[in-house]
């Protein structure tokens, strides 16, 4: 059995979700390759250390460049604010490391295309973190569509009922101009679902 050293950039909601998921692989899947939580990267050394202890990582850092350069880290998960995705992904791909990047890839179509091109040029595996399309309900819809049980889909409507901005004082990174707000955070899920269901 071999392991793969995981580095996660971002300790917030999705950083925690990925950390818990990787830590659970051995108890859920029978696989020869086991993820090992090597490094968590957060915006400050203090928060990185808190996440390291909470999620079970070996190391903590606030410098993503340091983490990408670490030979113990063999794959990178980008779960940081959207404005950081592009530079981190390009550096990780240049270092020869597979990347799982939360959506959206970049802040623009140009950034996203350059990230995809860099992965293709390097011949490195990369993936966007579209989790909703992997839910059992979504998989069942896809199965029904493939079997012709629903018929031809001619129209799609998506609705996301999230409460991120219910408190006008909250906002967080979604309220920052460079983050593309709720559209940048949630619309990719709807676009991905439409593509998966309708082709």
Q: Would you name each region that the model predicts?
A:
Residues 1-55:
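N-terminal Rossmann-like dinucleotide-binding module
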Residues 15, 85, 190:
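Catalytic nucleophile loop
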Residues 37, 57, 73-76, 150-153:
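Local beta-strand N-terminus motif with an aromatic residue
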Residues 58-63:
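Conserved SAM-binding strand-loop segment of SAM-dependent methyltransferases
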Residues 75, 81-133, 148:
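Beta-strand-loop-alpha-helix segment that lines the small-molecule cofactor/substrate pocket
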Residues 79-80, 160:
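Glycine-rich, N-terminal phosphate-binding loop of Rossmann-like dinucleotide-binding domains
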Residues 132-199:
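Predominantly a Rossmann-like dinucleotide-binding segment in NAD(P)-dependent oxidoreductases
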């Amino acid at each position: 059995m071999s392991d793969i050293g995981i580095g996660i950039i971002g300790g917030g909601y999705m950083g925690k979700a990925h950390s818990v998921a990787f830590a659970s692989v051995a108890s859920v899947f029978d696989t020869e390759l086991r993820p090992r939580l090597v490094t968590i990267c957060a915006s400050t050394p203090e928060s990185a250390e808190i996440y390291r202890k909470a999620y079970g990582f070996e190391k903590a850092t606030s410098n993503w460049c340091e983490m990408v350069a670490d030979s113990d880290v063999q794959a990178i998960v980008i779960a940081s604010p959207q404005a950081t995705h592009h530079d981190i992904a390009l550096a990780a791909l240049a270092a020869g490391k597979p990347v799982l990047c939360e959506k959206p890839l970049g802040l623009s179509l140009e950034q996203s295309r350059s990230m995809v091109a860099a992965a293709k040029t390097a011949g490195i595996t990369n993936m966007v973190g579209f989790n909703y399309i992997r839910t059992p309900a979504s998989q069942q819809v896809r199965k029904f569509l493939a079997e012709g049980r629903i018929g031809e889909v001619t129209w799609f409507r998506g609705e996301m009922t999230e409460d991120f901005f219910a408190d006008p004082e909250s906002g967080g990174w979604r309220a920052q101009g460079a983050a593309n707000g709720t559209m940048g955070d949630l619309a990719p899920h709807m676009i991905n679902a439409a593509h998966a269901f309708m082709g």
